[in-house]
């Protein structure tokens, strides 16, 4: 063992992903707080859903194009699951899953990371923050 050097792992970020160092992270947090305050001023409530969803829930009737964008995984129970590619599909699942707790009209917002397994490019990332706002069952958005 003496004389053998451990090889170091080269630190690197996956293609299509990015780190936010303190300056950028603080700016992003300030922008998010401002957006949240505006949404809440207009009567929208925050909702959070898991980053992972069942594959059939995410695909629904989304077709082949959506299918290509998924980061696929398998749960410990061997169920097909994937990282969410947007925040709207999980919201639709939430509305269908909790009809007694969530009554229309329901105004909600969500912010968080989403993942798409498409080709990254300038300004196009595989993980990015999405801001989503919906007025379910409301005649108007205000």
Short names for language-model regions:
Residues 2-142:
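TRNA-recognition modules of translation machinery and tRNA-sensing kinases, especially anticodon-binding
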